[in-house]
Amino acid sequence: MKDSIIAKLESLKERYEELEALLGDVSVISDQDKFRAYSKEYSQLEEVVKCFNRWTQLNQNIEEAEILLDDPEMKEMAQMEIEESKAEIEEVEQQLQILLLPKDPNDEYNCYLEIRAGTGGDEAGIFAGDLFRMYSRYAESKRWRVEMLSANESEQGGYKEVIVKVTGEGVYGQLKFESGGHRVQRVPKTESQGRIHTSACTVAVMPELPESEMPEINPADLRIDTYRSSGAGGQHVNTTDSAVRITHIPTGIVVECQDERSQHKNKAKAMSVLASRIVQAEQERQAAEQTDMRRNLLGSGDRSDKIRTYNYPQGRVTDHRINLTIYRLDEVMNGKIDELIQPIITEYQADQLAALSEQN
């Protein structure tokens, strides 16, 4: 491992030990803001410091074993210790490099998940409902909270559009690579000839930004309409105009929220989604102007980019970005999507490592 990386790790370890002492200080404990900030930083450093401590211990094991190589009775055991430690060091160094990669500051945020039916008519709406259930079950397995913000149901079941907020630890970092075009190939229930149809939905994942990071939005740039909430399946229909539709005139972005009975709450939620969409649109514009490793992985960053195909007759799911195919479609649609999500994250980290190696 390079001296510069070791120096960086030693610096992080010093800070970790400093924070450990601070968290035991009475003056810090009595200051909630300081204690919360130090606790968060301490938690963020914990994994990398433990990993570095293991690396240090393994190197120490090798040094001690090398001394025993001159002892005929201990030579074989010492040689084994050296080989095992060197093999583990390789794994630990790889882990350390990943832990030191620049973090996306948005990764720890909650997120907004939007699913829209695309080509395919009623079948696309049904597939949008299938994707919504898939993500909801995945969120449930992670103990995340899913909050419905807006739903436009389609006539044959499913949704023309559904927007939810997902709350939990590291939500955006786990789901951000789900943005893009999702395609389904199957025989619709209404198909009498048994022909396979292809339909599509687009998924967009955006971080929920804290107030300090929200863009300034000029009220004069907004058109706000109110209307009566349709309710879920005709139930609990509001008799007041509590649903809110906000149009950002300069960008043409439209956000609707009808989940709450209070117009004020719906407006606040819609404004939060609007802010995230404006930031996302700007980021996509910048990504279109430059080619980098994230753009290579996510395609052009356009939500219509086809990223995944769900083929029902073959029981397979294919992620086209990394040419990954798995034959457990039923499990995937029931929310077991870690084996699709984790390889993409790993590939992204590998791209980052490769880029850093080129820079160095």
UniProtKB/Swiss-Prot annotation:
It is found in: Cytoplasm. Residues 285-295 have a biased composition (Basic and acidic residues). GO terms for cellular component: cytoplasm. Disulfide bonds: none annotated. Keywords: Cytoplasm, Methylation, Protein biosynthesis. Residues 285-309 are annotated as: Disordered. GO terms for molecular function: translation release factor activity, codon specific. PROSITE patterns: RF_PROK_I. Transmembrane segments: none annotated. InterPro entries: PCRF, Pep_chain_release_fac_I, Pep_chain_release_fac_I_sf, Prokaryotic/Mito_RF, RF-1. The keyword Cytoplasm applies. The keyword Plastid does not apply. The modification N5-methylglutamine is found at residue 235. Methylated by PrmC. Methylation increases the termination efficiency of RF1. Belongs to the prokaryotic/mitochondrial release factor family. Peptide chain release factor 1 directs the termination of translation in response to the peptide chain termination codons UAG and UAA. This is Peptide chain release factor 1. The lineage of its organism: Bacteria, Pseudomonadati, Pseudomonadota, Gammaproteobacteria, Pasteurellales.
